[in-house]
């Protein structure tokens, strides 16, 4: 998983 994916999930 990329940092962007983790950020996206955390954002929601």
Curated annotation (Swiss-Prot):
Designated name of the protein: Putative glycosyltransferase
Family: Belongs to the UDP-glycosyltransferase family.
Cell location: Secreted, Cell wall
Molecular function, one GO term: glycosyltransferase activity
Organism, as annotated: Taxus baccata (English yew)
Coiled-coil zones: none
Lineage: superkingdom: Eukaryota
Location (main, coarse): secreted
Principal EC category: transferase
Keywords: Cell wall, Glycosyltransferase, Secreted, Transferase
Entry EC number(s): 2.4.-.-
Gene Ontology CC: extracellular region
